[in-house]
Amino acid sequence: MLQTPMTGMVQKLDQKLPVANEYLLLSGGVREGVVDLDLDELNVYARGTDYDMDFTLLVPALKLHDRNQPVTLDMRHSALCHSWLSLRLFDEGTISKWKGCCTIADHINGATNYFFSPTKVADWFYDSISIVLSEIQKKPQRGMPKVEKVEKNGTIISIILGVGSSRMLYDIVPVVSFKGWPAVAQSWLMENHFWDGKITEEEVISGFYLVPACSYKGKKDNEWRLSFARSEVQLKKCISGSLMQAYQACKAIIIKLLSRPKAISPYHLRSMMLWACDRLPASYLAQEDYAAHFLLGLIDDLQHCLVNKMCPNYFIPQCNMLEHLSEETVMLHARKLSSVRSDPAEHLRTAIEHVKAANRLTLKLQRRGSTTSIPSPQSDGGDPNQPDDRLAKKLQQLVTENPGKSISVFINPDDVTRPHFRIDDKFF
């Protein structure tokens, strides 16, 4: 958790933010899929050209505490995994502070009902941050980062700070923070999961968020999306290094290849990986030298989800995150993925070259000055899991030794003591 001087100054500006607040800092920007947000409205930033490191900071505008029972949200007006938020849950003081950031509707009993508006909250937050940053720049203090860029991307505020010779991108997201667990995801807890026995249920269900994003047909001014970013930080502790390496490699490929039109995001890939962890035997996923096989499996899973227009939210499986896609978009991306599947090593090498080029730009800038240490975020994998040449070589070996053949991961849950994968109709 991190409380930044900037958000502290925003709190002092008009006393809207909670005084005792917790901010979740995640390694990787919103474009990296660390939070389930829509990427359509985001400006394109390139690592190396625009920034060297990226983070996502979740800033609670409101907090609701656990009442020792599942949290029930008002989902009558929303698609699955989304909700409106009425300020009737809060005291009069909170309503008075925030009613300017609400839409208004008449309640059934004749009273005025204020619904917390994600777009209005984002507008207020951007204006407040702009005022605070302007004040900071007027009176610069020793050791304070240099503000290089501030932009509003939909409901997200993106700030690039210069710290020493490093440029850090922060995607700041205003959220509503809840302690406890939503009633709509209660049935998920009843299922068996890969993390059972590795971490406690209390660690997984310690809290969730509403983030400012609406469903495909939802009302932008009213609808929030459920986010389980806090839980995902805990679940990542249970994922093997080789699978995380495959995930990072696959993510690097799809960010470049499937960027237009927006259909598949890194968050979709993350959800597929979590489902794979539930589906496959732990002893298989623990294999240290199986990153290449895992990458092929993730590509296959991605292709399957696209063709079937089906990617269930990991925590709320009844919510299909791809149901809104058109057939045209599905087929376009499916063809692109087929090209990756036919020569995954080449596409991975291209992604690696992009990473290396970005790193060269970063090093070039860092030689001009010394770097300054930064706070450690809740890591999304970090550099050790970046795609590397060894994985590309392993993929190349699998493809070269079996020209023109379909290679897929196959799991026999009754026997995971040796490699299992399929080449055409033969299993090995």
Swiss-Prot record:
Keyword Transferase: yes
Short name of one Pfam family: Mab-21
Start and end residues of each stretch annotated as Disordered: 366-389
Enzyme class: transferase
Keyword Ribonucleoprotein found: no
Annotated Polar residues bias: 368-379
InterPro entries with a match to the protein in the record: Mab-21-like_nuc_Trfase (IPR046903), Mab-21_HhH/H2TH-like (IPR046906), MAB21L/cGLR (IPR024810)
Cleaved signal peptide residues: none
Family classification: Belongs to the mab-21 family.
Function of the molecule: Probable nucleotidyltransferase that catalyzes the formation of cyclic dinucleotide second messenger in response to some unknown stimulus.
PANTHER family: CELL FATE DETERMINING PROTEIN MAB21-RELATED, NUCLEOTIDYLTRANSFERASE MB21D2
The protein, known as: Nucleotidyltransferase MB21D2
Organism: Mus musculus
Gene: Mb21d2
